Amino acid sequence: MKNKTLKNIASQRLFLPIFCLALVLLVNIITTPNFFSIEIRDGVLYGYLIDIINRASELVILAMGMTLVVSASAGTDISVGATMAVSAAVCCNILTGGERAVTAYANPLILGFIAALVVGAAIGCFNGFLVSRLNIQPMVATLIMYTAGRGISQLITDGQITYVRVDSYRILGGSFPGFPVPTPFIVAVLVVVLTSLLLKKTALGMYIQSVGINKRASQLVGIKSVFIIFLAYAYCGLCSGLAGLIASSRIYSADANNIGLNMEMDAILAVAIGGNSLGGGKFSLAGSVIGAFTIQALTTTLYAMHVSSDQVPVYKAIVVVIIVALQSPGFARW
């Protein structure tokens, strides 16, 4: 009876992501003194835990879009990191008026933000068209922007890092004056809530799962599978554009070589750790959120243990192997 109860608990969708996050946090508690200690400095919350929550914000946003892509198309969008770089470059180029560095906006801030989001969504639409209309494999289709994205960013910025040294630009990646909670975390929460409402209050969530499970059968019952897949990629592009804005705001610049670097792998891993099948179909936004925090907690832990940035991907790869093994049918039978 006891073994059956444990097996039922372990079979729950959120068991694996919660277990992984708890395991990483346990390691932090053992290795890092005062890990859960939180204090306020200059009106802003500080601490290891706050740093993880803050730094995971872009990944949480990306994971929302990636979850829909994986569920609808049984594929992944490996261009999200490059899309972040392009969106950041577009925003900063508009705000600087083409100059390398400014201390005052050349154009309205809202114009730069809207342009970045539109560009992100446009890249997502391009990917969605290739996958849904031309039936190109998702990884191959998104490989185009993965390869060309940073080159496009370099063209936009003339191969230089563009700086926007204006205090208001840093609010999106920092915090509002007098408000202790990091702005990126607030934005991430809003994206998660809005995505959840969109999928639960409309039939979109059901359609995405249906298309992911069986595209042909969905078409036969009247679901526009092509449009659903297209929409998933467009939304993923929009999320990437927003994440790019936050990343750019953190460093008040557009760095084509570093913004969004390796974020595509982290986003895919967050979705996988979240208990979502990479084969499409049913999905869990909550699982993806937990997966994103787990990845960021793991990254922060490795850096705290003085693991070099070159070696961090190796440890993440080990995690991928373990997660894939745990989700395999063979392990489930065992």
Q: Which residues does each predicted region cover?
A:
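Cytosolic-side transmembrane-helix boundaries in multi-pass membrane proteins
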Residues: 1-30, 193-194, 213-216, 220-227, ...
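Membrane-interfacial amphipathic/re-entrant helices at transmembrane-helix boundaries
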Residues: 1-62, 101-109
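Hydrophobic core segments of alpha-helical transmembrane domains in multi-pass membrane transport
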Residues: 17-30, 66, 116-120, 146-151, ...
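Single transmembrane alpha-helix segments in multi-pass membrane proteins
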Residues: 28, 45-98, 131-136, 271, ...
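Alpha-helical transmembrane segments within multi-pass membrane transporters and channels
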Residues: 100-145, 291-294
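Helix-loop-helix "hairpin" substructures at the membrane interface of multi-pass membrane proteins
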Residues: 108, 112-114, 122-123, 179-255
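Transmembrane helix-bundle core of multi-pass membrane transporters
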Residues: 134, 138-201, 228-231, 250-260
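Transmembrane alpha-helical segments in multi-pass inner-membrane proteins
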Residues: 240, 251, 255-317
